[in-house]
Swiss-Prot record:
Belongs to the UPF0597 family. One of its GO terms (biological process) is L-cysteine catabolic process to pyruvate. InterPro entries: Ser_deHydtase-like_asu, UPF0597. This is UPF0597 protein TTE0269. GO terms for molecular function: L-cysteine desulfhydrase activity.
Amino acid sequence: MRKDLLILTDILKANVAPALGCTEPGAVAYAVSKAREILGEEPREVYVAVDRDILKNGMFVSIPGTKEKGLVFAAALALVCGKSEYKLEALREATEEDIKKAHKIVNRKAVKIVLEKDAEGLYIKASVVGDKHRATVIVKDAHDNIVYEERDGVVLKAKEENLKEDKSWLKAKIKEFTIEDFLDYCDSVDFKEIEFIGEGIEMNKKIAYAGLNEEVGVGIGKMLKRQIRDEESLAKALTAAASEARMSGYPLPVMSSAGSGNHGLVAILPIAIIGEERGYDREKIIRAITLSHLLTAYVKAYIGVLSPICGCGVAAGVGMSAGLTYLLGGSRKQIKGAVSNMLAGLSGMICDGAKIGCAYKLSISVTAALEASKFAMENIFIPSDNGILGNTAEESIKNLGRISVEGMKNADDVILDIMLKKQ
């Protein structure tokens, strides 16, 4: 394998990790947990400042193992029992007694969540106050990337001292590669280097079948279950059911992709289900999912970690379309064509926060990615003179990034304003 591609293994490991519940409340819980540990005494209250996308995505999503929603309860529960060693799964050991204590914290209004209007990109600042001390932690650029720690005005860690742990530079480095590079990597990398990718198959299938067979959410998974007739409809039903369970707070982790659990569901499940049902060997399936993860991360690097564009539907959908076409034996031209087909059809899906309705968006994404791949396998490619498409798949992705970063600057403000008025 080409030496310049070796870093893609590190990029994969930085992007693919387990997450319990929605990533945004998990990230807030992680920051609060770390601040509470630094505090070194009984916490009295916590102040959390977040960027608009963290606020938007954490507002109406359920907290695993509880019947509660939102960032306030996530922060309160982290004050009681959060463990920073588990990072985005900081709340995974919460008990019923812990939940009762968290309710008391919320009821005495000891948790304040505020919008940091000037924050650029992903930003969480958690300040935990006790009777004698105060501790502050800042998470930036990635959900699990702590860049600053302080206790009573004394800086314990700053970004400059934390470069080895800061993976945001590593995630951004993916922009230096092309789809050809990703394909060379997936074809030639030693299977042992990417075997860990397979852990996400079993992890995500477990919550998918829970969502399909148990009473969760509003019944999206159950309805799609009644429509299962082949491996493609099974893949769609399981992906949507997994998201519905996750957004409802079902207490099982998922394997994330590019910093999001829902991204991981789309990037992994459809390829795994279709591959297994059609009898493909496990190595081929994992190599295809590896391509899916790489394309998902590539799109996210351009549209932003948190974006007005639905990353679960569009970014992970692009990854899925490429990975599925790879699995089915498509040529490199067809794989790139599937990417452009997907962007031609679904690039306009917005992100209006994490919630149960995301399950429906994932269902739509899987359907679109299946069709984008089928079109490509039949050598049907949406022409490059259509809309935002570029002359190459990479150009199309970069154009989507321009729309997200330059063209939708006010979209999140409007979306968030609409959501806040419903509280």
